[in-house]
A protein has these predicted regions:
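Short, structured segments at the rim of ligand-binding sites
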Residues: 1-144
Length: 144
């Protein structure tokens, strides 16, 4: 069984852009897709480096993250073939019809983006690979 952690962010201030260096990535490689989504809602540029390993997961997650954020209207670039530079877009577009590349982590990111955008949530079946009760958990925390 893989260990699970919980991160709680509290505060009354806006989030600041982050700069995540290569040496931090190996311990958080599976969290990079959701971190990239969070960065897309922060004013300023965030840089996440050392993402080579994302290219060899269930899909090329680096390209998958890039395509999802770009389709949403986020200013995002891949630098040196292994880093993401992410800036909030002026207008964030619909999250409908985004391609998860049949990758469970990208599918969860799309579902989270749909929650943030207030859109209909697409719980793709591929999510069950790593988080079988994701849909049920999300439904318990959503309040109309």
């Amino acid at each position: 069984n893989e260990q699970v952690g919980r991160i709680t962010v509290k505060g009354d201030k806006k989030l600041s852009p982050c700069n995540i260096a290569d040496d931090s990535i190996s311990s958080m490689i599976d969290e990079i897709p959701i971190l990239a989504l969070v960065c897309s809602y922060i004013d300023g540029e965030s840089i996440i480096s050392g993402l080579d390993e994302l290219r060899y997961k269930e899909s090329d997650r680096l390209i998958g993250i890039y395509n999802i954020l770009k389709a949403m209207g986020v200013s995002v670039n891949i630098n040196n073939n292994s880093s993401l530079a992410i800036k909030r877009g002026k207008n964030l577009y619909s999250t409908n019809n985004l391609d998860n590349l049949n990758d469970h982590r990208l599918a969860m990111v799309i579902s989270c983006a749909q929650i943030i955008q207030g859109e209909k949530i697409d719980f793709d079946d591929c999510i069950k690979v790593s988080f079988p009760n994701f849909k049920e958990l999300v439904e318990t925390i959503l309040v109309d």
